[in-house]
Amino acid sequence: MITKDSIETAYSFLHQKQRIYVHSTLDWQKDDIEIAIATYADEMSQELLDDMSSGRADFLRDHKRFQEDITEAVEILENML
């Protein structure tokens, strides 16, 4: 079961990192954010991650799609609040 707390926690963390990522001009900072989010995705509610990812195993872990994925995740979580 996905709890309201897990949604709020994920939203807060991902939203904050997404805002920084989108406006950052520093490659090392973007890389650090990608690593932090991938680690968070590994540890977050699997049910919540599955709902956001539509079954994609590399969701929030693919460097080439990261900005698209984190933006989508924030939108999904916002709608779940």
Question: Predicted segment positions?
Answer:
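Acidic, low-complexity, intrinsically disordered interaction modules
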Residues: 23-70
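Non-transmembrane amphipathic alpha-helical segments
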Residues: 14-21, 40, 47, 77
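Short intrinsically disordered terminal tails
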Residues: 1-5, 56, 75-81
